[in-house]
Amino acid sequence: MSDDLFERRQAERRYALKFLDYEILSSKGEVTGRGLARTLNVSESGLRLETGQFFEPEQTLRITLGFDNDLVQINGCVINSQPESDDLCSSGVMFLEFDEADRRTYQKHFTALKSALEE
């Protein structure tokens, strides 16, 4: 990782632009909103996304990512959200919950991305 004293990330990031679908979940697990976003970077434990929606810290999202012919669904918690322009915000999301099959699929694609970027 970085020697930067202000860097708080625990996992190394890989830069990959993918589109994703998200649902905003209430504290009761009910869907209160939905939209599309794109990933700015991904790691084993989270991702940074860009969208027109500003999220509050600790907001729970259900994210669906598409990898080739695979769909992966992840529940995550917004760690931070900041405006990037008048129309766009970026948000850091920490993964909370994976189905085991989705975890394996995500890990397979993340490992392939990591290998491709290291070459």
Task: Please place each PLM-identified region on the residue numbering.
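Short conserved beta-strand and strand-loop elements enriched in small hydrophobics
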Residues: 19-26, 59-71
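Short, surface-exposed secondary-structure edge patches
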Residues: 11, 50-54
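Short, solvent-exposed secondary-structure boundary/capping segments
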Residues: 47-51, 84-95
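Short beta-strand-centered aromatic/proline hotspots
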Residues: 74-80
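N-terminal helix initiation/capping motif
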Residues: 1-42, 107-119
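Hydrophobic core residues within well-ordered beta-strands of beta-rich domains
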Residues: 16, 35, 61, 72-74, ...
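Short solvent-exposed strand/turn elements
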Residues: 15, 21, 55-57, 89-108
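Short, conserved beta-turn/loop elements at beta-strand boundaries and strand-helix junctions
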Residues: 25, 44, 81-86
